[in-house]
From Swiss-Prot:
One of its GO terms (molecular function) is rRNA binding. GO terms for cellular component: cytoplasm. NCBIfam families: PRK12289.1, ribosome small subunit-dependent GTPase A. Its cofactor is Zn(2+). Zn(2+) binds at C259, C264, H266, C272. This is Small ribosomal subunit biogenesis GTPase RsgA. It comes from Microcystis aeruginosa (strain NIES-843 / IAM M-2473). Belongs to the TRAFAC class YlqF/YawG GTPase family. RsgA subfamily. The lineage of its organism: Bacteria, Bacillati, Cyanobacteriota, Cyanophyceae, Oscillatoriophycideae. It is found in: Cytoplasm. Signal peptide: none annotated.
Length: 358
């Protein structure tokens, strides 16, 4: 390890916890991770620091493996749920079994991913629990939806060559329902990282959440993989008129011709080129009703969600709950900051990850 102080180093934020940031440097000291704080001037101008941010680090001390983030470079992309920057593609992970593939749930994840405008890849894990006929059927089915899936088995270590090629030299966000094997997938792609693995629970066939914070992992092919906290059902919070463009099947139909009306909802309007016999049309109609209901609810609140927050239950039912009033807190004392620093300065990145599992 180099015991020196350098200035103007650049790197990527790979983890955020409390008021500290793990930065993976991309300079001559490749592979070094520094535990950094954020400069006070960044706080004053309201500059947040997110996982995935490209940052400039000052006062790097490789003896203590510490530094200070002095600048956050412009972001190419930004996702708020989970909070991560500069993602280039989303890898949606599902399971062929345990839990079983649910077309409606897959559609929700696909629509949510499409709304980001990022490239989308689909991975189906646990193919060792199914039959070859199932794999073929789902391959054709997802292709009909506009996606080319990668079929893998973490248990049997199968199918990873093509998947790694897809992840090569990209920053990828991993997402999908809980219990499909995302943590096991990361363990297989990056053996030196030991992610907690949760079993699939009982009758509901839903996985237990094993990831609590967004983290970036370095892949052997120079890509970066962001593991997001598992969740069972993403929300549909787009505008009704935007939903059409989040289905590749609809985009393909509109590329061949236009509907008679510019504001066509593709339900009962005459001369509609979208309405018809395509598999996910019913999913589109259900999500459209959800988007319309959400928009109407927002219009009824004069403050546009300023005092209410939207909650979506597992059945897709929307409810609004009052937001907690904002509170003013005292500025953290210097002594408290020093105590936090002492607790973190001797920790490795793996130690911080292990804290999440407690």
């Amino acid at each position: 390890m180099v015991d020196a102080q350098l200035t103007d180093l650049y790197g990527t934020v790979v983890a955020v916890q409390a008021n500290f940031y793990q930065v993976r440097l991309d300079s001559a000291v490749m592979g070094e991770n520094l535990l950094c704080t954020r400069r006070a001037r960044l706080q004053k101008i309201g500059q947040s620091v997110m996982v995935g941010d490209r940052v400039r680090v000052e006062e790097a001390n490789f003896g203590d493996q510490q530094g200070a983030i002095a600048e956050v470079l412009p972001r190419s992309t930004e996702i708020d749920r989970p909070a991560v920057a500069n993602i280039e593609q989303i890898l949606l992970v599902f399971a062929l079994a345990e839990p079983v593939l649910d077309p409606w749930l897959i559609s929700r994840f696909l629509v949510k991913a499409e709304s980001t405008g990022l490239e989308i890849a689909v991975c189906v894990n646990k193919i060792d629990l199914g039959e070859p006929e199932q794999i073929e059927v789902w391959g054709d089915r997802l292709a009909g939806w506009g996606y080319r899936p990668f079929f893998v088995s973490v248990e049997k270590n199968r199918g990873f060559e093509a998947l790694l090629a897809q992840l090569n030299h990209k920053i990828t966000l991993l997402a999908g329902p809980s219990g499909v094997g995302k943590s096991s997938l990361i363990n297989c792609l990056i053996p030196e990282i030991n992610q907690r693995v949760g079993d699939v629970s009982g009758k509901l066939q839903k996985g237990r959440h094993t990831t609590r914070h967004v983290q970036l992992f370095a892949l052997p092919n120079r890509g970066l993989l962001a593991d997001s906290p598992g969740f069972n059902q993403p929300d549909i919070n787009c505008l009704p008129e935007e939903l059409t463009f989040y289905f590749p099947e609809v985009r393909a139909r509109l590329a061949l011709g236009n509907c008679q009306f510019n504001d066509c909802t593709h339900r009962r309007e005459p001369n509609c080129v979208v309405r018809g016999d395509w598999e996910r049309y019913q999913h589109y109609l259900e999500f459209l009703e959800e988007a319309i209901a959400r928009e109407q609810s927002l219009q009824k609140t004069s403050t546009k969600e300023s005092s209410l927050k939207l909650k979506i239950k597992e059945a897709g039912q929307e409810t609004y709950e009052p937001k907690l009033a904002n509170k003013k807190y005292r500025r953290p004392s210097r002594r408290g900051k020093n105590q936090d620093q002492e607790r973190y300065e001797n920790k490795t990145l793996q130690d911080i990850y292990n804290d999440d599992s407690e």
